[in-house]
Regions:
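Charge-patterned, phosphorylation-rich low-complexity C-terminal interaction regions
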Residues: 291-327
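Long, non-catalytic protein-protein interaction scaffolds
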Residues: 1-303
């Protein structure tokens, strides 16, 4: 039985399945430019209590981040329709930035090593302007889903198992925003009660919820499946700059060293689409209530245990894995 069939039957968790797909698609904890990518799953970062029975709590998993609001999508479509490259080298696209890149990864994880040093390396030895640093989960969501035309980023796996990355335990001087706010720990939504462990517990519980389980196949179609490229990507408002697609870049055919280096730099800095794993619509997961064994259900105690495992951090043998194998 394939891993996909096991997931459809409810024998493995959504987290486990996403990690499996990322690995098959060439994503690795050891490569910041092709780091594992996970979806934004929630849209409610204001409520005091998180209601996982309300569909409005969740992000629309059938649409990429650039299409979460009609107004912003229209701006991307306008660029796509009106695109005109006299040289003919760059075909029309909707999104000129990517949902996963080295800079996105280290920006999310800047408060924990070794990502702090990697962030400083990419930034020329200093932290970014405080107003551009990751400092609030809600603000990051609004930027990626609504407010910023240059931001369509998704998440990294650590959002679902590692409370440490939300805490400035090392007391880094991250700067002061124009509003006067000094950056420290990441500002959490009210339902997290100011507790990074509680945020991770509820976020992981949301990932394994009935709603996400019933719609995760749609996000898989966008990132790893048939809606990743071609006409299906156009129809799903999921078309990125052509250099983000591995099949569109043939380094052997680029004779000019400057052009080759520029292309390599573009991919390293702005990210790359994962390898395509599925050519047909991904099957839907069956109802958890009827298929998921008790030991795979997410309870408060189990989720807290996940958070406890994540806190241990990296080991010498696996510097970037944070004990994911135990989850």
């Amino acid at each position: 039985m394939s891993v996909t069939q096991r997931w459809v039957r409810g024998e493995i968790s959504n987290f486990q399945y996403l990690m499996h797909l990322n690995t098959l698609a060439g994503r690795s904890y050891n490569d910041l430019s092709q780091y594992p990518v996970f979806p934004w799953i929630l849209s409610d970062y204001d409520s005091e209590e998180l209601d996982l029975t309300n569909p409005n709590t969740f992000r629309d998993l059938s649409k990429p981040m650039g299409a979460q609001t009609p107004a912003r999508l229209e701006q991307f479509l306008k660029r796509f329709r009106e695109w005109d490259d006299p040289s003919g080298e760059t075909p029309p696209y909707m999104y000129g930035t990517h949902y996963s890149s080295a800079m996105i990864v280290v920006s999310y994880l800047v408060r924990v090593e070794p990502f702090t040093q990697q962030f400083l390396k990419l930034q020329g030895g200093h932290f970014d302007l405080a107003d551009r640093m990751f400092h609030s989960v809600k603000d990051a969501w609004l930027s990626a889903s609504r407010n910023n035309m240059a931001d369509v980023k998704e998440l990294v796996p650590e959002f679902f198992y590692l409370p440490n990355f939300l805490l400035n335990s090392n007391h880094f001087e991250l700067g002061v925003k124009q509003s006067g706010l000094r950056l420290g720990d990441v500002i959490l939504p009210p339902w997290a009660k100011g507790d990074a462990r509680e945020f991770v517990r509820l976020h992981r519980q949301a990932l394994e919820s009935d709603y996400v389980s019933a719609h995760l196949n749609q996000w898989i179609d966008l990132i790893f499946g048939y809606r990743q490229q071609g006409q299906a990507a156009v129809d799903a408002f999921n078309l990125f700059h052509h250099l983000f697609y591995e099949a569109n870049v043939n380094f052997e055919a680029i004779e000019d060293p400057l052009t080759k280096n520029a292309t390599i730099g573009f991919i390293n800095n702005f990210g790359q689409i994962p390898s395509q794993l599925f050519k047909k619509p991904h099957p839907v997961k069956r109802s958890l209530k009827s298929t998921l064994p008790l030991q795979h259900s997410i309870s408060s105690n189990a989720a807290c245990a996940v958070a406890q495992q994540g806190v241990e951090g990296p080991t010498a043998a696996g510097p970037l894995f944070y004990h994911v194998a135990r989850i």
